[in-house]
């Protein structure tokens, strides 16, 4: 893996990720079009790093069918990287 300190250290289909398990951030592949994804990607603008997981490739969003759990929280079912429609 390639160590990084900011997004521009990585390829376009990667993100600079600090997943808290490794001592240093590294370049990780972003989720591709129609791939299952995690909506847990958190971007910290001041550090120019993502935490937990990478987002989808540019122009795609991690979206799924929203449903409510027993506590009234919205949960995404089967999220995938899709291009949002206008």
From Swiss-Prot:
GO terms for molecular function: toxin activity. Keywords: Secreted, Toxin. Expressed by the venom gland. GO terms for cellular component: extracellular region. Disulfide bonds: none annotated. The keyword Translocase does not apply. It comes from the Eukaryota. The keyword Transferase does not apply. It is found in: Secreted. Belongs to the neurotoxin 20 family. This is Toxin CSTX-20. The lineage of its organism: Eukaryota, Metazoa, Ecdysozoa, Arthropoda, Chelicerata.
